[in-house]
Amino acid sequence: MNAPAPSSIRRTKKLPPLRVGIGGPVGSGKTTLLEMLCKAMRDRYDLVAITNDIYTKEDQRLLTVAGALPEERIMGVETGGCPHTAIREDASINLEAVDRMLARFPDADIVFIESGGDNLAATFSPELSDLTIYVIDVAGGEKIPRKGGPGITKSDLLVINKTDLAPLVGANLDVMASDTRKMRGERPYVMTNLKALDGVADVIAFIEKKGLLTV
């Protein structure tokens, strides 16, 4: 990972909670990443999570069953339409969800917001998210990073997940890393195998440094 330089400014309780948006295509590993982050960070930070699905609250259920956080700290949002719209053009349903969660948990340090599965053009409204993490996966093919799109080129952190599948799909991780650097410039990225927890610590380090969290 090409990590950002640490900041001398530290986030305190006087600052609003950090809002971290997690986006990416269906099946890339967004919910798994959110689960791993919650489990790894919940003993140090006060966390709440909001998930987006079009017609169900399946991701909320999955996180609850996995024990990522207590049930009352996970809210599911049914967007009823394009998942991109609910995090960008009209984020009101998610902004309302954030307000409701912070009314319940006013001391929250981090609000995680997982978008519904979307395409490479998905981005979060700056009103909704302070940091954006975009998740793609190796199973989508070696070419994915060079396809571009705001999720790949403009997200604060790009996560390339399921590195363990590279031999099975004929993907060269070195090529993917090179293409990622060409598309993102100095913006950081992390290669992960979330099921084995590989790379999770790097994602957490990014959130803590870039999000000005006290540690």
From Swiss-Prot:
Sorted alphabetically, which InterPro entries does this protein's record hold?
CobW/HypB/UreG_nucleotide-bd, P-loop_NTPase, UreG
Question: Is Chaperone given among the entry's keywords?
Answer: yes
Give the principal location in a single coarse category.
Answer: cytoplasm
**GO MF annotation, one:** GTPase activity
Its GO biological process annotations read: urea catabolic process
Q: Which GO terms describe its cellular component?
A: cytoplasm
List where in the cell it is found.
Cytoplasm
Q: Which residues cross the membrane?
A: none
Q: Keywords in alphabetical order, please.
A: Chaperone, Cytoplasm, GTP-binding, Nickel insertion, Nucleotide-binding
Which residues make up the binding site for GTP?
24-31
Quaternary structure, per UniProt, is: Homodimer. UreD, UreF and UreG form a complex that acts as a GTP-hydrolysis-dependent molecular chaperone, activating the urease apoprotein by helping to assemble the nickel containing metallocenter of UreC. The UreE protein probably delivers the nickel.
Q: Which family does it belong to?
A: Belongs to the SIMIBI class G3E GTPase family. UreG subfamily.
Q: What does this protein do?
A: Facilitates the functional incorporation of the urease nickel metallocenter. This process requires GTP hydrolysis, probably effectuated by UreG.
Q: What is this protein called?
A: Urease accessory protein UreG
